[in-house]
Amino acid sequence: MRFTATAAALVASSIPATLGQHVRDLSNEKWTLSSDALNHTVPGNLPSHAHLDLLKAGVIDDPYHGLNDFNLRWIPESNWTYTTDKIKDLMPIEFCGKYVASTNNQYRQYSFDVSQILEGCNEDPILKIDFGSAPNIVNAIAEDRNSPVWPDGIQQTYEYPNRWFMRKEQSDFGWDWGPAFAPAGPWKPAYIVQLPKAQNIHVLNTDLDIYRKGQINHLPPDQSQPWVVNASIDFVGSLPPNPSMSIEFKDTKSGEILTSKRIGNVTVSGNSVTGVTVLGGVTPKLWWPLGLGDQNLYNITVTVTGHQNQTLAHVTKRTGFRTIFLNQRNITDAQLAQGIAPGANWHFEVNGHEFYAKGSNIIPPDAFWPRVTEARMARLFDAVVAGNQNMLRVWSSGIYLHDFIYDLADERGILLWSEFEFSDALYPVDDAFLDNIAAEVVYNVRRVNHHPSLALWAGGNEIESLMLPTVERKAPEEYAKYVGEYEKLYISLILPLVYQNTRSITYSPSSTTEGYLDVDLSAPVPMVERYHNTTPGSYYGDTDFYNYDSSVSFNSHVYPVGRFANEFGYHSMPSLQTWQQAVDPEDLHFNSTTVMLRNHHYPAGGTFTDNFHNTSLGMGEMTIAVQRYYPIPNKLDSVANFSAWCHATQLFQADMYKSEIQFYRRGSGMPERQLGSLYWQLEDIWQAPSWAGIEYGGRWKVLHYVSRDIYQPIIVSPFWNYTTGDLDLYVTSDLWESAKGKVNLTWLDLSGTPLPHNAGTPGSVPFNVGALNTTKIYSTNIKNLTLPNPKDAILVLSLSGEGHLPNSDKKTTFTHQNHFTPVFPKDLALVDPGLELSYNTKSKTFTVEAKSGVSLYTWLDYPADVVGYFDENAFVLLPGQKKEIGFTVQEDNTDGKWVQGVTVQSLWNQTLEK
């Protein structure tokens, strides 16, 4: 690489479109990868990881195959050098043989002035980046006598220990749903930028904050106030005195210019230039989440000019006008009068409207981020939209999501609850660590602030709800100390930094919290957390809930009653097709060594390769759940039996999530006024047992189909107390206006014959359900029904109603179907439904028909080498009923031949030997 010795900077991170001259993308350069662990070099790439380059060079097999997460540990335990910057891990950087800098935070953007080094460089410049072994580095830090030591039994180690000392993706060190590859490498792009003269700048980052006049993060904005735009640009270089700024908003659909104006109050502070303007006299179209309105977007162009009107910087970002607010305020007298229980709110409001948040938690989609493409994430987010989800909680500790992922969410109306990267651990609070965190927070808050999909900033995952109670239980004498450290990091440090860089987003110190008592931004601890200051009979905060005692999985009395459910779930196995991507044929049985050791629930707690005791507990939980509630597979062919067992675990998982989601959604009309359900978890990081609804590669589990169904706007739900026999039917709606209609109740035996007198229940029940509410439409006790044989009976519930979707004048017809059986599926007197499947080449749809009996959990499956989803799946099909079902192809490597491999089965097939 040859450069002129003018002002030059190494910049590591994504780079915005600006007027910076001579920008060289280092991804286009030739790189080599070397290590003492190898006796030769291999070609490298940027961005990349050592694992990926070694795989491409043929040095290693697929890291995801078999037990390679164990076999390839020599890679993360070695040092690696990329020669010829998002810079990851602790790594010295050399340019022209001269030391440039060391970095210690994967989440920051770094820029370095190398002009003097370049000026003295008499040879072709060589850039060298050394990556130390992350596991070795954190262990060395832990052994330093000056490093903090926490009480025994507090810190959560999954595989590699001491992750909390490094600002690196925490799940790189292992988690209970993923491997511990701890990859090293330049995981984001890097650039060399040359500025040809003084008073010329290059844009590093942009903060565009759009909010209502007078808006404060933790208070509801006044929707009658005009919009305010605060535009701030971070740069390298130097600005001339008294620069000017202007903005232009252009509708991305129509191309119409909303407004174009010069910004007043331009200030320069350090390497940032900022201007603020009020958009008076304009009425932009609002951005709404999925199902609540349109996703109206605008391109905002910010231009910085000098005193002679020459353009110094020019940045265009896509944005939207919306307010999003997490309401944690005390319940008002007006709410009490409506029957809402006392305590405090915990729900989101968009553009002044409270709404029901329906969604899940997203984890890293891959252990190696450089191979996560926009197309791959688009497929995932299309599945989110198809699943009727309007919010994802971006779990920490993965990474702060790339801008292109926020772009995908902006387009699709998916709100992203975002978090700072701290999870299930206590962290250092020394000055150097806090300074590092401060830079990380400021960079990322500013970077993503223009995205209308951004819903919240939370301080971290389960710090308040898990870590502090663990300290209180195991080291009560030190509880006050660690509460103080928690507040120092998450409240005294991070909260003010968020407030200083955005007025449009609420901040919560922890993902699961009881909320706050008071906010005083002038106080040393600006937010007073509620902690244990609660009153019996009152509700506060959000909940997470995991109970692996499957004997109570369908007992709604054990589910937490709260304002918002942000985590809940149970694990299941991926499908046979997904297992076959990573596991050898001889290992395709439920308790093979490979299958068991790829299950990290429960985690090893260290770098053990014989975690059979802990993993057998998790495998046993799935096994016992299936045995309790579903027919036990016993097929003669071992692979077919393995596949049937995998499917059975998915049936249990889906039914359990359905039971909980119905309960939480019903809470919208209960005293708890519950307004959110985000289950754990959306997708997988690799092929293994987990809580995911979408497998690695994109195949939907039963869960994602079932959650899509139960996340529809209006649903009918049965609630059965199997101890007392009480059966209640509810209609729940998340519309913003009342809706009315009827629910048909049809009792049948499993051959499809109607039961006499409809078993003593009415044939239909009318309903009128209020806005964002629920209503009980029928109540009885199973003992009062005239059921000839409870094992040979099913109640089919069919809802039809009318209402208006939010922000729509058009009346819409809503339908939903549910069912109830008076015994659990394993005790049903199943009959062969006689399923037949056909395909129409013209309409490209499948038709499924049940010829001889009720088909429960009707399941269409497709072969490997294609990715997509059916319009409907895991449904009830009655005798003589035909259902036409389409299939959305997201990726096809079969040239259309996959159609020939589509199959259909039902719960009946789980009872067969073949």
From Swiss-Prot:
Gene Ontology CC: extracellular region
Catalytic activity: Hydrolysis of terminal, non-reducing beta-D-mannose residues in beta-D-mannosides
Active site: 462 (proton donor)
UniProtKB keywords: Carbohydrate metabolism, Glycoprotein, Glycosidase, Hydrolase, Polysaccharide degradation, Secreted, Signal
Pathway(s) it belongs to: Glycan metabolism; N-glycan degradation
Gene3D superfamilies referenced in this protein's UniProt entry, alphabetically: Galactose-binding domain-like, Glycosidases, Immunoglobulins
Key word Thylakoid present: no
The keyword DNA-binding is assigned to this record: no
Function, as annotated: Exoglycosidase that cleaves the single beta-linked mannose residue from the non-reducing end of beta-mannosidic oligosaccharides of various complexity and length. Involved in the degradation of polymeric mannan and galactomannan.
Name of the protein: Beta-mannosidase A
